[in-house]
Amino acid sequence: MTSSMFRSPCKIPSVKGFEQKSYVGLKAASYNVRVNSFKSSEVASQLQKIDSTLIWPVNALEAPPVPSKPATPLIDQPLQLSRRARRNRKCPTQRAAFQETNISPANFIYPLFIHEGEVDIPITSMPGRYMLGWRHGLIEEVARALDVGVNSVKLYPKVPEALKSPTGEEAFNDNGLIPRTVRLLKDRFPDLVIYTDVNFDEYSTTGHGGIVGEDGVILNDETIHQLRKQAVSQARAGADVVCTSEMLDGRVGAVRAALDAEGFQDVSIMSYSVKYTSSLYGRFRKVQLDKKTYQINPANSREALLEAREDEAEGADILMVKPALPSLDIIRLLKNQTLLPIGACQVSGEYSMIKAAGLLKMIDEEKVMMESLLCIRRAGADLILTYFALQAATKLCGENKRFSSN
């Protein structure tokens, strides 16, 4: 006795569910069984049972019906509203026309880290950011920024340890990294607006924003004497705006007087008037220092306004708030108090949080980036110093091109 089994194409139609619309059932399988003559009726009976089980889907139960879509509730009449705010939001054209706050590449200052070497070094705690070689990498990055309308940059130096000292003399070396870089950029890009940092900590062996006395106290007046010389050196190199970022008393007035005395009346001062002691700073720094004796307590708002008022009286041209997103209330209060332009610094920690969450697919990085910048503008900032400057400006340029092509 011999038998063989082989598969043949199925001729049984597919089974569909309720009204044959949304549900597609299982497709039947079919087999042909060729049975030779058997001497045993019992074997033939078993094969018939096997054959009946191989085509079970044909007799399978239908799938349960798909639930119907809930009907819209019926109302007797619409609400009698004198105003429906949604009318002004019903189409893209109207939403764009009524938008109260706008942002453009002209609002951005692009912070750039530079060092003496030629190779661009990644900053591990800030995805996408680099310590740029001051001659090649920097020039290329500035050119990219200018291509998308970012015409302002701020320079931050990585000073070699061998050049640091307790009193920071390298800060006002006319042949130092910052003056050389400013001259190079002005030669290549004459219309570029260059902001420089009048800041002591990068040049100090202690890392503090001032000369540290024997008792551990920051020496206010002695440090300002050094900052004045630093500001003049930067102005001499061609800086357009010097930024007094150390929260030391009287620094703005002293720097203004020094600049004027040297004939740099047209060089502006952007004062970091409100610089909070924030945990969002300097994730690219190796050492975190306690700077609470000269930076502002994040719990205080009146103190922040007082500092800004004093800087304005001393001759500041722009008032800066740092960090940006945690200080939106301060930006608004300051906007209501002064007629001076206001800057906001979206610091490294703010940048890294958005970048990290974007890389982990927890948020839409681009949308959160643009929303954060728009909120800073809405609060009252005229300028935003942001590591997103190039990325955001590139997106804005793309949107403008799409709009003009339509």
UniProtKB/Swiss-Prot annotation:
It is an enzyme of class 4 (lyase). The keyword Ubl conjugation does not apply. Its EC number is 4.2.1.24. 5-aminolevulinate 2 binds at S348, Y387. Residues 1-34 form a transit peptide. The keyword Magnesium applies. It is found in: Plastid, Chloroplast. It catalyses: 2 5-aminolevulinate = porphobilinogen + 2 H2O + H(+). Pathway: Porphyrin-containing compound metabolism; protoporphyrin-IX biosynthesis; coproporphyrinogen-III from 5-aminolevulinate: step 1/4; Porphyrin-containing compound metabolism; chlorophyll biosynthesis. Its cofactor is Mg(2+). This is Probable delta-aminolevulinic acid dehydratase 2, chloroplastic. The gene is HEMB2.
